[in-house]
């Protein structure tokens, strides 16, 4: 109550921010007459003037009023479009490291030109980040005339571009590209073998479009570049044949309960667990198939990999559904993004899950992958000096933006008042009743000439609705991952009178639905249209536009609630753009996933008791409140998972930055001989100390062992025993010096054979190759450590602290191994001719190219590990003997981890 009163008196933080910025808008508006008087050349010259002022020490902030006024005037001349005052506000929000929430249709693309121009003046580059290649190309081409008019260059960073073209795109003042491509380029740059292979500059300013989709929805999926590991496809096929023999255990209170099954499914945590009966059954089947020996246990240490195959196969069958989580096209399993409904060509699930799904679908199984480099979007975007973003729906996630990215959210007012009518949800008992009600609603609205957009959460659901519409004889378009190429055309015409469009989730995001359809796309179909034809197309569009407005504008139908309120709001936001009329309604059933998992059984019980007749809907604030609570629960859980993922990745991030900094320094220098000499001294000291401990008696020395080690690991044949026999006065310090002197002498002779320049080149190549090889092994070791670390919770230890401690120890060991391996390799490799170094270099290049071609850009399912880690932290709470084991196995505690204690 008190907070509401204070907000009323002083205004919210959002109001105060906008009040401050409106003063600057007044200044920009006052400059407009002055800018209008400038000739085109004088307006263009302003860019050169601003850059000169920055060089003299002025700040970017001091240029805001004048720079924004210049961009607004240039936009009027190039596009015939003038930035509204609210767009100037949005531009200022984006310049202040904030998230700007701007409603659909408020011109986010034009707003972005203001901060992009302002921050590109420093010459350090601006990255505009979009969710797909189509939007990156569209926005770049649309804004190119404006930026080029102002003397700025524009680049497009597309996937699949060769390195020189990418370097050129990054060298531009303003670069457009997708979040994935920027992230993968960063990883690839840190795998380069020469400075010329790198494409990115220093990360200066990122302006993220649809920021909620990229920084929140995608934050659970790290970017991973991986290469092929050993082939185990045969095992996936064998294990896959066993899974259909297993029976899923239903809940005891369900109608289909038939006693204990073989495995249980936790839909909330996306986990599958074997029951006691299931373990016995699967062991018998594995023995029958000849995969496991009689009397062996699936949980024995020798069967760890087999357990991995069984778990992956169970998850593939029980949790992943064709046409919902993936599609099969041309004999290939392609992931469908759960957030956008788009197919993700080239992305693969990790942990053997993708191979298990391939075995299930009977397509060719591709090899498992080994991680070569990885980073989360959270850590990638925090590398930028300055980060900002815009979206139509950010306010529900403001806390997360603030706590993880240190970005405040500012809600920018609309240019015209919003008049869309959002109707309450209708809840039906069954899915079939709900679909029937949706069809009737569509029939009534299209009869009145009103366009309808139906939002579904999966390809499967969109095809069910499509099938029912076909039966009802209603013409419609389907927009889902299967028809990706036609996406923009379908969205452009979704505002036609009586048009019906079915869209998966947020497909078509970033393209406005114009009431009456898009006259631009009609013109694009005409070859060299005459002025009369253009006028006719526009006149026809105006008639259609007015007819749609009269019928009530675009109507949105949601076929079920999404896990996140934000994505529901995005669907609603497709209607009512720029003050147009519009309406929306969600249709739900008690069989929907969200209702089934989170809304309690009491709701369905209550509906049955009320004596609801088939086809009847319930519309009550209690139900709406129950749904909102369920969504809040899911959002809170997903936030915990993302936060957990980030806390673990922060540990790896510190190590990644240290390695990448070291690697880039190594790439930029030509002579690493000083470093080699320094680490040679460290390596030989440690090696000699292992056989001749400091300040020890001669009886404790293992001279023969030392001689053998020097010969085997460094190809150094030194008569250490002979020296000691002939010179009794030799003590450990002088002996160490003599061994080192001999090692340096042998190395110098090797250098004389190939020449100094070639040797420096060779040293650098060996260091890079060794660093990459050990870093790759370290990443795999970190993955294994991560998978089991949550079990430390049973020992009352904090898994995160344990992970930090152990991974640091592993990192320190890796650095020591790096020194040893480099000196050992340089000592053992016999180089007799300069051509041999060239040949080795060529071989390394070919191997790097081969790996690059086989690299996978994969989509990791880290949320499961994070969920496990959350679940395993039991603290001091005592687990009862008959309680379910906290590890999620489905067994009682006494039969699982309780037995161990």
UniProtKB/Swiss-Prot annotation:
Cofactor: Zn(2+)
Binding site for ATP: 87, 105-109, 512
Positions annotated to bind Zn(2+): 885, 887, 896-897
Entry membrane topology: Peripheral membrane protein
Principal EC category: translocase
Membrane-spanning parts: none
Gene3D superfamilies hit by this protein: Helical scaffold and wing domains of SecA (1.10.3060.10), P-loop containing nucleotide triphosphate hydrolases (3.40.50.300), SecA, preprotein cross-linking domain (3.90.1440.10)
UniProt induction comment: Repressed under conditions of excess protein secretion capacity and derepressed when protein secretion becomes limiting. This is regulated by SecM.
Cellular compartment(s): Cell inner membrane; Cytoplasm
This enzyme's EC code(s): 7.4.2.8
GO biological process, one term: protein targeting
Biased composition (Basic residues): 891-901
Superkingdom of source: Bacteria
Chain residue ranges for the region called Disordered: 853-901
Quaternary structure note: Monomer and homodimer. Part of the essential Sec protein translocation apparatus which comprises SecA, SecYEG and auxiliary proteins SecDF-YajC and YidC.
Function: Part of the Sec protein translocase complex. Interacts with the SecYEG preprotein conducting channel. Has a central role in coupling the hydrolysis of ATP to the transfer of proteins into and across the cell membrane, serving both as a receptor for the preprotein-SecB complex and as an ATP-driven molecular motor driving the stepwise translocation of polypeptide chains across the membrane.
Protein name per its UniProtKB record: Protein translocase subunit SecA
């Amino acid at each position: 109550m008190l907070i509401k009163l204070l907000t009323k008196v002083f205004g919210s933080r959002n109001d105060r921010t906008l009040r401050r910025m409106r003063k600057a808008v007044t200044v920009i508006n006052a400059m407009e007459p002055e800018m209008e008087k400038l000739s085109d050349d004088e307006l263009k010259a302003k860019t050169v003037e601003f850059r000169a002022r920055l060089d003299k020490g002025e700040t970017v902030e001091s240029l805001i009023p004048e720079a924004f006024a210049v961009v607004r005037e240039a936009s009027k001349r190039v596009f015939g479009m003038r930035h509204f005052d609210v767009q100037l506000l949005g531009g200022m929000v984006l310049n202040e490291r904030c998230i700007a929430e701007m409603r659909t249709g408020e011109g986010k693309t034009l707003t972005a030109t203001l901060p992009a121009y302002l921050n590109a003046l420093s010459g350090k580059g601006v990255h505009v980040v979009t969710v797909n290649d189509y939007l990156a190309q569209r926005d770049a081409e649309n804004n190119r005339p404006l930026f080029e008019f102002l003397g700025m260059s524009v680049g497009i960073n597309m996937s699949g571009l060769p390195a020189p073209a990418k370097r050129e795109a990054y060298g531009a003042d303003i670069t457009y590209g997708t979040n994935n491509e920027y992230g993968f380029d960063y990883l690839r740059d840190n795998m380069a073998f020469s400075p010329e292979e790198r494409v990115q500059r220093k990360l200066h300013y990122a302006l993220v479009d649809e920021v909620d989709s990229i920084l929140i929805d995608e934050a659970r999926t790290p970017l991973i570049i991986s290469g092929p590991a050993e082939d185990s496809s045969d095992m996936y096929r064998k294990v896959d044949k066993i899974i259909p023999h297993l029976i899923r255990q239903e809940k005891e209170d369900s109608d289909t309960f038939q006693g204990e099954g073989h495995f249980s499914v936790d839909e909330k945590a996306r986990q599958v667990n074997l029951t006691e009966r299931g373990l016995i059954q699967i062991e018998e089947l594995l023995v029958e198939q000849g995969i496991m020996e009689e009397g062996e246990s699936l949980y024995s240490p020798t069967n760890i990999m087999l357990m991995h195959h069984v778990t992956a196969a169970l998850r593939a069958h029980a949790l992943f559904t064709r046409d919902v989580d993936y599609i099969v096209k041309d004999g290939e399993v392609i992931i469908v993004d759960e957030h956008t409904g788009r197919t993700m060509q080239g992305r693969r699930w990790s942990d053997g899950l993708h191979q298990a799904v391939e075995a299930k679908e009977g397509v060719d199984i591709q090899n498992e992958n080994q991680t070569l480099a990885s980073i989360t979007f959270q850590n990638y975007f925090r590398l930028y000096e300055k980060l900002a973003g815009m979206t139509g729906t950010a306010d529900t996630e403001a806390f997360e933006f603030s706590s993880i990215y240190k970005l405040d959210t500012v809600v920018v007012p609309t240019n015209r008042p919003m008049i869309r009518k959002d109707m309450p949800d209708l809840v039906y008992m069954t899915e079939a009743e709900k679909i029937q009600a949706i069809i009737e609603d569509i029939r009534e609205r299209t009869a009145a000439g009103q366009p309808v957009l139906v939002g579904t959460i999966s390809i499967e659901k969109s095809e069910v609705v499509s099938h029912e519409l076909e039966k009802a004889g209603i013409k419609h378009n389907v927009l889902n991952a299967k028809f990706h190429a036609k996406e923009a055309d379908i969205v452009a015409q979704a505002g036609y009178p009586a048009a019906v469009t079915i869209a998966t989730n947020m497909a078509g995001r970033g393209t406005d639905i114009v009431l009456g359809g898009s006259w631009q796309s009609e013109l694009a179909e005409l070859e060299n249209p005459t002025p009369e034809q253009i006028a006719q197309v526009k006149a026809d569009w105006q008639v259609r536009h007015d007819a749609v407005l009269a019928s009530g504008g675009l109507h949105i139908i949601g076929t079920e609630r999404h896990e996140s309120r934000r994505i529901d709001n995005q669907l609603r936001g497709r209607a009512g753009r720029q003050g147009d009329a519009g309406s929306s309604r969600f249709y739900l059933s008690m069989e929907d996933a969200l209702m089934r998992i989170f809304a309690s059984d009491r709701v369905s019980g209550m509906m049955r008791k009320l004596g609801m007749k088939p086809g009847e809907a319930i519309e009550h604030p209690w139900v709406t409140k129950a749904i909102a609570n369920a969504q809040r629960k899911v959002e809170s859980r997903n936030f915990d998972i993302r936060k957990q993922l980030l806390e673990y990745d922060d540990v790896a991030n510190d190590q990644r930055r240290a390695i990448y900094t070291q690697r880039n320094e190594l790439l930029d220098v030509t002579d690493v001989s000083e470093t080699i000499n320094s680490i040679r001294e460290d390596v030989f000291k440690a090696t000699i100390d292992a056989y001749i401990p400091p300040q020890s008696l001669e009886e404790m020395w293992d001279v023969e062992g030392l001689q053998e080690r020097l010969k085997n690991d460094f190809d150094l044949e030194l008569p250490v025993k002979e020296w000691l026999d002939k010179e009794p006065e030799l003590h450990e310090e002088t002996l160490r010096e003599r061994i080192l002197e001999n090692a340096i002498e042998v190395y110098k002779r090797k250098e004389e054979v190939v020449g100094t320049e070639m040797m420096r080149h060779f040293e650098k190549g060996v260091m890079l190759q060794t660093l990459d090889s050990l870093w790759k092994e370290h990443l795999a070791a970190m993955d294994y450590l991560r998978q089991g670390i949550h079990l430390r919770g049973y020992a009352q230890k904090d898994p995160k602290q344990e992970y930090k401690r152990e991974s640091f120890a592993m990192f320190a060991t890796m650095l020591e191994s790096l020194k040893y391996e480099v000196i050992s390799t340089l000592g053992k490799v016999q180089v007799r001719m300069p051509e041999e170094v060239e040949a080795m270099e060529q071989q390394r290049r070919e191997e790097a190219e081969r790996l690059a071609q086989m690299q996978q850009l994969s989509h990791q399912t880290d949320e499961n590990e994070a969920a496990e880690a959350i679940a395993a932290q039991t603290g001091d709470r005592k687990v009862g003997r008959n309680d379910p084991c906290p590890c999620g196995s489905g067994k009682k505690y006494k039969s699982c981890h309780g037995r161990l204690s």
